[in-house]
């Protein structure tokens, strides 16, 4: 176990993530820099920006902090992000590609429920079970189910400006 108050060596590793199994598949070796922004006020809870020398295309990337202390190496996950929107520049020697990356919640934020989408009270489905089912259905990220037996007391209908993310958040609230 790392003693975070003592000295250690630190580095970072970046892996492409299989969107089906959600496992690391390939180490990315061409990352020049990375910034992670965590924002509890943002709907998707944060983002990241990666500077690379090659385009990797749209994919999920998992970022790890690697620590070495007293000869013990540990890998600490910092987040998994959907990488997209590359912009590039070339200074004559080095190609620099900046890629924006977003938490997996982006998939739920970009899609809307059909007009009039409703979870009816009569289905007798627990609220958190319904939230889990919808999050799992409309995103590729694994979703951990929450335990709750609370049921709807009335029909729950999506608003015209709801995204799947806002609908699920409102349902679970």
Q: Where in this protein do the model-derived segments appear?
A:
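Charged- and aromatic-enriched interaction segments used to assemble
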Residues: 93-98, 102-173
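Assembly/oligomerization scaffold segments
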Residues: 1-117, 170-173
């Amino acid at each position: 176990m790392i003693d975070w108050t003592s000295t250690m060596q630190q580095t970072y590793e970046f892996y492409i993530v299989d969107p089906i199994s959600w496992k690391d598949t390939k180490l990315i070796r061409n990352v020049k820099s990375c910034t992670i922004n965590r924002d509890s006020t943002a709907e998707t809870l944060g983002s990241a920006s990666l500077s690379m020398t090659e385009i990797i295309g749209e994919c999920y990337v998992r970022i790890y902090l690697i620590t070495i202390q007293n000869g013990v190496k540990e890998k600490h996950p910092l987040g998994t992000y959907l990488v997209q929107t590359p912009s590039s520049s070339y200074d004559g020697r080095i190609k620099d590609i900046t890629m924006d990356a977003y938490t997996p919640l982006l998939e739920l934020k970009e899609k809307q429920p059909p007009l009039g989408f409703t979870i009816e009270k009569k289905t007798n489905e627990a609220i958190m079970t319904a939230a889990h089912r919808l999050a799992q259905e409309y995103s590729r990220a694994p979703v951990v189910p929450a335990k709750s037996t609370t049921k709807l007391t009335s029909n729950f209908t999506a608003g015209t400006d709801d995204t799947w993310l806002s609908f699920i958040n409102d349902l679970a609230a």
